[in-house]
């Protein structure tokens, strides 16, 4: 096991391209994206009641080495400040498995 940073971002789908571009610019190339996210926060509740996918919320989860967390914040913060959204970064432990289950 080794320490990594877990990055979670919720934003409008419209900003997804900018967020992904920022992550990849820093070298965070492994991430998952979940579309049509409903949530509730200090600004109220956001439901997935739109037929237009450009107005949906997305959830991006990525993991990176601890040294990349600060550059991620510097790139993501202006996007979220301008267009809205939330970002959380936490410390987690990664377990790397190099053993193929099929060979067991």
What does each model-found stretch correspond to?
Residues 1-104:
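Positively charged, small/polar-rich N-terminal and surface patches that mediate targeting and assembly
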């Amino acid at each position: 096991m080794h320490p990594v940073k877990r990055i979670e971002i919720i934003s409008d789908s419209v900003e997804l391209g900018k967020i992904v571009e920022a992550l990849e610019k820093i070298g965070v190339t492994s991430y998952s994206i979940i579309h049509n996210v409903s949530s509730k926060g200090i600004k109220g509740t956001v439901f997935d009641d739109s037929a237009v996918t450009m107005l949906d919320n997305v959830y991006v989860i990525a993991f990176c080495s601890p040294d990349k967390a600060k550059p991620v914040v510097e790139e993501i913060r202006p996007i979220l400040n301008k267009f809205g959204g939330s970002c959380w970064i936490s410390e987690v432990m990664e377990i790397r498995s190099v053993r193929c289950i099929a060979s067991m």
